[in-house]
Regions:
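DUTPase catalytic domain/fold
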Residues: 2-258
Length: 258
């Protein structure tokens, strides 16, 4: 792990003291996707959590989220072999990190490169090699309480630039509120790609659902620390290690007969 505490990069103006995240204060009624007016109303009522709140990031039917500071590299062991994602030890070996994004200036000096145009020298960046995949996170803590669910989609600009942001895991169950983990993959075969920290990289879409029985943590919540915690506690207790997959927590079941 890089030197320093996992919370070294926590540029949130303050730790908000808010009520318990369950049950919701109010529930938006309707069908389908939340519109921007419904999103704003749900944020105001406490049914949707979006912190830090930036109104300009609320689009017509989604909320833009930005790239956070921490990341894990994958497949750092180039000797090949087998990876068992259901073994906690294998998971720890497979993922390299967590790493903290370096400033543009420091990265350029370390790699004997000139500064890239447009990107400020003091901007933290993550540089992906051709074909490289990393685990990264949103800077924002975001999600919706039950009833309701959400998905994360890459912003189209990144897709057009050959970068997959949510490779295959962009679903947020009812009640999941946290920083979201992103599987970012550079699909370019010959070009490195620069990812500035703080850049809008994905968008969260919220959906209406019917009543939900049970809480996220009890139903499927391997990645939520405490559904009853307030937002301030989530922010204070967040660690980069929460990005790592936890398939080893699933119960193994015998194959059902045909």
């Amino acid at each position: 792990m890089d030197e320093g505490n996992s919370q070294a990069f926590m540029p949130l103006a303050s730790t908000p003291q808010v009520a318990s995240m369950t049950p919701p204060v109010a529930v938006q009624t309707g069908d389908g996707v939340y519109s921007n007016t419904q999103i704003k109303a749900a944020i105001k009522s406490g049914h949707i959590v979006f912190h830090p709140y930036i109104e300009e990031h609320i689009a017509g039917s989604s909320v833009d989220v930005t790239l956070g500071h921490w990341y894990y590299r994958t497949e750092r062991n180039t000797n090949g072999g087998f990876y068992n994602p259901f073994d906690e030890g294998d998971v720890q070996k497979y993922f390299d990190g967590p790493h903290s994004a370096e400033t543009h200036q420091i990265w350029a000096e370390a790699n004997c490169r000139k500064l890239f145009s447009v990107i400020p020298a003091d901007q933290p960046i993550i540089v992906l090699a051709p074909g490289e995949r990393i685990l990264a996170h949103t800077h924002e803590f975001i999600g919706i309480k039950a009833p309701g669910t959400s998905t994360m989609q890459a912003r189209s600009t990144w897709g057009r630039n050959g970068v997959a942001v949510c490779l295959d895991a962009g679903w947020g169950d009812p009640g999941y509120i946290n920083r979201w983990t992103m599987e970012i993959y550079n699909m370019n075969q010959h070009h490195f790609v620069v990812l500035p920290v703080g850049e809008r990289i994905a968008q969260i879409v919220f959906y209406h659902t019917g009543p939900v029985e049970g809480q996220y943590k009890k139903l499927s919540g391997k990645y939520q620390t405490d559904t009853d915690a307030d937002l301030g506690s989530l922010i204070q207790n967040w660690r980069p290690e929460q990005m790592l997959p936890r398939g080893y927590k699933d119960k193994r079941r015998k194959t059902l007969p045909l």
